[in-house]
Design a protein with these regions (language model features):
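Glycan-recognition and catalytic cores of secretory/periplasmic carbohydrate-active enzymes
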Residues: 1-138
Length: 138
């Protein structure tokens, strides 16, 4: 399951239907981190650490982790999915026991947010956040 969730970010799987496949990794991670906090299960922790590494390996040179291509980004459910990627990473960061992995997460989150901030806003060549989706009236 975790491998499949992370694999969604290796190609623009949501381009064709502007779907929301990208939200599941973060939702699963959030719940799994809460479960780990309760159980402290070593096998679960290792599984989570491994899938975090797999997801981080999907980050492109621009800083994006998305199931949308750059040509299709910031429409449909893209920003919603990116939010869940960030939330999932942050939840794991809170339980992460490896300093290097924590640093890698921090760097990734900063790069992702820098990219979003550069493209979403009221500035020139930026897309207004209310125009990033037609769902829920933008």
């Amino acid at each position: 399951m975790w491998q499949l969730a992370a694999e969604q970010f290796t190609a623009p799987v949501d381009d064709a239907d502007l779907g929301w496949r990208g939200e599941y990794w973060g939702k699963l991670m959030r719940g799994a981190c809460m479960t780990w906090e309760y159980t402290r299960d070593a096998a679960l922790y290792q599984l989570l650490a491994d899938t975090v590494d797999a997801l981080l390996d999907c980050q492109d040179e621009a800083g994006r982790i998305s199931t949308y291509s750059p040509a299709q980004e910031f429409q449909g459910w893209d920003l919603w999915c990116r939010k869940y990627v960030l939330l999932g990473l942050w939840h794991f960061h809170q339980i992460c026991q490896d300093v290097r992995q924590k640093q890698r997460i921090e760097q990734s989150v900063c790069r992702q947010l820098d990219y979003i901030e550069a493209h979403i806003g009221a500035g020139v060549n930026q897309k207004k956040i209310t125009r990033t989706s037609t769902h829920w009236q933008g």
